[in-house]
């Protein structure tokens, strides 16, 4: 399943990823990892203000 994920950074810049396949935190809880159909993003948690995702991923 692909869904939309929005990441807002502490400097109020944002990125919207339309074709997210999965997301989660690294084992040490310092990185946020996002896999899309085209790319893999690894973002330090200290740079993230908040994360929002499409609610359809919770409908199972």
PLM region descriptions:
Residues 11, 21, 36-38, 55:
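Short, well-ordered turn and helix-capping elements at secondary-structure junctions
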């Amino acid at each position: 399943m692909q869904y939309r994920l929005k990441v807002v950074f502490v400097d109020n810049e944002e990125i919207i990823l339309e074709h997210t396949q999965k997301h989660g935190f690294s084992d040490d809880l310092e990185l946020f990892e996002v896999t899309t159909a085209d790319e893999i993003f690894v973002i330090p948690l200290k740079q993230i203000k908040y994360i929002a995702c499409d609610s359809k991923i919770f409908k199972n």
